């Protein structure tokens, strides 16, 4: 499964921006129609039961739409619903522990902000989220902004698939792809769009695809 993943447009769902669970389901369905290959549930303010209810609804929807479903940080929720993977940050559970819990077939992503973190990436990681590329308001505890030059340096220094994240929208996604990443992780530009499918399709086309 992991060999077939298209990271080009990686949707990160924010319940506040999407308008709750119903909005997240609507946005997910539209984004998959536009070419999104990975969908991540990220809801740091939520209680565990809310995570579980949302993941239970999103997992079959993503499977039906052909997208990989990833849960941010909450390994227990991912296991409970049979999610495809988990994405963790530098202060979350270690990747090796996540791999042990999730098993060999799970997709595991890790956030990276600088060369020191990149050098310490464990072998159990499958892909890296590099960022924030630009300033973002969707992550309150975001690390320092990378910019395109540092993004390119990090992407060139790893053999793992990479996804740029942080402040990415159609207006700047072309430059992010040009920096050498395999995909763009997008939150507000898709979640708040009047036509999420059209925005996703536009982002997808910037990498030279058609959906």
Curated annotation (Swiss-Prot):
CDD domains: TMP_TenI. 2-[(2R,5Z)-2-carboxy-4-methylthiazol-5(2H)-ylidene]ethyl phosphate binds at residues 136-138, 167, 187-188. Binds 1 Mg(2+) ion per subunit. GO terms for cellular component: cytoplasm. One of its GO terms (molecular function) is thiamine-phosphate diphosphorylase activity. Its EC number is 2.5.1.3. Gene3D superfamilies: Aldolase class I. GO terms for biological process: thiamine biosynthetic process; thiamine diphosphate biosynthetic process. Mg(2+) binds at residues 73, 92. Coiled coil: none annotated. It comes from the Bacteria. Pfam families: TMP-TENI (PF02581). Signal peptide: none annotated. Pathway: Cofactor biosynthesis; thiamine diphosphate biosynthesis; thiamine phosphate from 4-amino-2-methyl-5-diphosphomethylpyrimidine and 4-methyl-5-(2-phosphoethyl)-thiazole: step 1/1. Keywords: Magnesium, Metal-binding, Thiamine biosynthesis, Transferase. Its cofactor is Mg(2+). It is an enzyme of class 2 (transferase). 4-amino-2-methyl-5-(diphosphooxymethyl)pyrimidine binds at residues 40-42, 72, 111, 139. It catalyses: 2-[(2R,5Z)-2-carboxy-4-methylthiazol-5(2H)-ylidene]ethyl phosphate + 4-amino-2-methyl-5-(diphosphooxymethyl)pyrimidine + 2 H(+) = thiamine phosphate + CO2 + diphosphate; 2-(2-carboxy-4-methylthiazol-5-yl)ethyl phosphate + 4-amino-2-methyl-5-(diphosphooxymethyl)pyrimidine + 2 H(+) = thiamine phosphate + CO2 + diphosphate; 4-methyl-5-(2-phosphooxyethyl)-thiazole + 4-amino-2-methyl-5-(diphosphooxymethyl)pyrimidine + H(+) = thiamine phosphate + diphosphate. The keyword Magnesium applies. InterPro entries: Aldolase_TIM, ThiamineP_synth_sf, ThiamineP_synth_TenI, TMP_synthase. Condenses 4-methyl-5-(beta-hydroxyethyl)thiazole monophosphate (THZ-P) and 2-methyl-4-amino-5-hydroxymethyl pyrimidine pyrophosphate (HMP-PP) to form thiamine monophosphate (TMP). Belongs to the thiamine-phosphate synthase family. NCBIfam families: thiE (TIGR00693). This is Thiamine-phosphate synthase. It comes from Laribacter hongkongensis (strain HLHK9). The lineage of its organism: Bacteria, Pseudomonadati, Pseudomonadota, Betaproteobacteria, Neisseriales.
């Amino acid at each position: 499964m992991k060999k077939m993943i298209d990271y080009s447009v990686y949707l990160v769902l924010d319940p506040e921006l999407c308008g709750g669970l119903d909005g997240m389901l609507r946005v997910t369905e539209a984004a998959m129609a536009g070419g999104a290959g990975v969908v991540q549930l990220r809801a740091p303010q939520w209680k565990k039961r809310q995570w579980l209810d949302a993941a239970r609804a999103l997992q079959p929807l993503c499977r039906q739409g052909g997208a990989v479903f990833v849960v941010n940080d909450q390994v227990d929720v991912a296991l409970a619903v049979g999610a495809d993977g988990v994405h963790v940050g530098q202060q979350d559970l270690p990747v090796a522990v996540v791999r042990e819990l999730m098993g060999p077939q799970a997709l595991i992503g890790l956030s990276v902000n600088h060369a020191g973190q990149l050098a310490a990436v464990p072998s159990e990681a499958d892909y890296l989220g590099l960022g924030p590329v630009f300033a973002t308001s969707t992550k309150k505890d975001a690390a320092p902004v990378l910019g395109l030059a540092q993004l390119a340096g990090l992407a060139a220094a790893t053999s793992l698939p990479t996804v740029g994240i942080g402040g990415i929208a159609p207006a700047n996604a072309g430059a992010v792809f040009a920096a050498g990443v395999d995909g763009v992780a997008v939150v507000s530009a898709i979640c708040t769009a009047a036509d999420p499918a059209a925005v996703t399709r536009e982002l997808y086309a910037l990498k030279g695809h058609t959906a």
